[in-house]
């Protein structure tokens, strides 16, 4: 699970939430307060909201509790409950960006655009970018289009924000029927074409359709997503091919425009390590546009990254079956179910998807991954067979499917098929370190192609020098080749990188034994046992080495004895 910093601290560095709440501030119910803090530190918004509500009931005038309660309600998606808390916080003299964000969102939801502008004029702020775009859309909501255009232009003049201002100006023009003006912006009349975000492409496609440029719209979809990409875009493409004129639906009015502002900011923050800030803006977007699939999916993905799998699953569930985004949502829901331990439910959902979408490679691939995760390798291999059977044209992007099937075949002891899959994956992606390492290590274990295996692993380690598994493979390869002194250096490095891995510690023990460091070998074998080998056969072999030594174990297994030395090679 991803590590989450304490809730209040995260927000203090982003949206301006207060950094700490003293225990003394929650004297009415210190236990509830402490439980809320713990839940918040784990991003458990539901539990945090429950405990903050209890603490606030015992101390209803406490503004810091109001603030933290509002944070938790936003996190769990109860924006309608967070808004009154923000209002109370504000009335009692509290002031910060989360309260301002919630109050501005409430005004947008009510479409009280005059009050929204007055709030900005009075100093309320949700951040420089939001404030500028919010003002522009509110002016549009008041019917003041020329003033709105000027406000969008003002945003474009702020350093680093030009593309945001242009994008929203284009949406605003399209929302009032000026498709020529909107197309000019997307095409680059104001200094180069806008960066092709998914939402931007969707908007431009709809604009081109309105301008009766269907061929250009189809070409834009193909250029941006390929022949079998995003299901929503493919649905638009089918409509265009059928001769339909697409309505402009990305933004239908000022409130939807304000929702798009919050979605834009959340998406921009998505690549940064500020998930709670991102979630707050995404929740505002969802609140203002509850039917917007993109906002729902963004919220769900953020929650998934935070480890809040139940909340994420509930979000994915909001996407209707007839929505083109349903496939993406169900794949996301299945992933959330897996992460929450409900693998059977995830498998069932994926099996249904496979029946409904039998030609979608990603469905079969995800089903295979789910089976493989549970070590159901035969079932996984069948699913990967289906996925590979659907691949046509450029195969390079699907190297991982052959790699995954190769792992299944290797585990099923079907080595010829496994080797062929690994070789195919390497043919598609020659320098892929995971494939190089896995195939190289497999050759080592089979005592085949040892020199080639070592070369593969060396390439993998060169690509990922801090990957303990790869360094372990390199050390083990040197050991297999009898280059024991060199193996010691690599295996010691592997243990530094993976100190509690039983296999790596066991390997280091063998290498120490090979160079005569008997006590250190025994110490490493005991460490390996303490970390719990996955298989009892592995543990039994380690215990036998401790009883009689590695040389005797190799003799009992009919294996070749250790070389005297090959370190001069």
Predicted features along the sequence, with ranges:
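Residue-level recognition of tetratricopeptide repeat
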Residues: 37, 71, 105, 137, ...
């Amino acid at each position: 699970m991803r590590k989450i910093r304490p809730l209040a601290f995260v927000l203090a560095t982003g949206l301006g939430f207060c950094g700490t709440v003293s225990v003394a501030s929650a004297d009415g119910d210190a236990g509830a307060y402490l439980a809320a803090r713990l839940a918040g530190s784990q991003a458990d918004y539901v539990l945090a909201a429950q405990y903050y509500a209890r603490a606030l009931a015992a101390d209803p005038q406490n503004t810091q509790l109001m603030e933290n309660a509002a944070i938790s309600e936003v996190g769990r998606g109860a924006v309608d409950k967070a808004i009154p808390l923000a209002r109370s916080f504000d009335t009692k003299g509290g002031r910060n960006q989360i309260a301002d964000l919630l109050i501005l969102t409430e005004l947008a939801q009510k479409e009280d655009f005059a009050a929204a502008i007055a709030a900005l004029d009075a100093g309320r702020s949700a951040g420089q970018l939001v404030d500028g775009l919010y003002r522009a859309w509110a002016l549009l909501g008041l019917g003041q289009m020329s003033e709105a255009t000027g406000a969008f232009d003002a945003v474009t003049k702020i350093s680093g924000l030009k593309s945001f201002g242009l994008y929203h100006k284009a949406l605003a023009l399209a929302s009032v029927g000026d498709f020529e003006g909107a197309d000019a912006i997307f095409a680059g009349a104001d200094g180069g074409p806008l960066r092709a975000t998914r939402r931007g492409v969707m908007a431009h496609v709809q604009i081109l359709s309105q301008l009766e440029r269907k061929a250009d719209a189809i070409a834009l979809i193909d250029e941006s997503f390929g022949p079998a990409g995003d299901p929503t875009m493919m649905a638009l493409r089918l409509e265009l091919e059928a001769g339909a004129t697409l309505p402009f639906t990305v933004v239908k009015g000022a409130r939807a425009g304000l929702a798009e502002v919050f979605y834009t900011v959340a998406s921009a923050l998505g690549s940064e390590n500020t998930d709670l800030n991102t979630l707050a803006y995404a929740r505002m977007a969802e609140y203002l546009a509850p039917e917007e699939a993109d906002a729902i999916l963004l919220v769900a993905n953020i929650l998934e990254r935070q480890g809040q799998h139940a909340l994420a699953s509930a979000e994915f569930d909001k996407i209707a079956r007839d929505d083109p985004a349903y496939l993406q949502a169900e794949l996301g829901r299945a992933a959330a179910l897996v992460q929450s331990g409900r693998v059977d439910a995830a498998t069932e959902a994926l099996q249904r998807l496979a029946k409904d979408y039998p030609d979608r490679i990603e469905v079969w691939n995800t089903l295979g991954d789910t089976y493989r995760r549970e070590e159901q390798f035969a079932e996984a291999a069948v699913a990967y067979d289906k996925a590979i059977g659907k691949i046509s044209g450029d195969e390079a992007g699907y190297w991982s499917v052959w790699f995954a099937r190769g792992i299944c075949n290797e585990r099923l002891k079907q080595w010829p098929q496994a080797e062929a899959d690994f070789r195919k994956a390497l043919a598609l992606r020659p320098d892929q370190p995971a494939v190089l390492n896995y195939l190289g290590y497999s050759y080592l274990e089979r005592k085949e192609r040892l020199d080639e295996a070592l070369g593969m692993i060396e390439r993998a380690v060169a690509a990922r020098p801090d990957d303990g598994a790869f360094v372990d493979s390199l050390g083990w390869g040197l050991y297999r080749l009898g280059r024991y002194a060199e193996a010691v250096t690599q295996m010691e490095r592997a243990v530094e990188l993976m100190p509690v891995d039983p296999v790596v510690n066991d390997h280091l023990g063998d290498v120490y034994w090979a160079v005569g460091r008997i006590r250190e070998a025994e110490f490493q074998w005991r460490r390996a046992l303490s970390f719990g080998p996955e298989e009892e056969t592995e543990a039994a072999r380690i215990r036998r080495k401790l009883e009689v030594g590695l040389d005797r174990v190799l003799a009992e297994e009919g294996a070749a004895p250790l070389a005297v030395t090959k370190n001069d090679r």
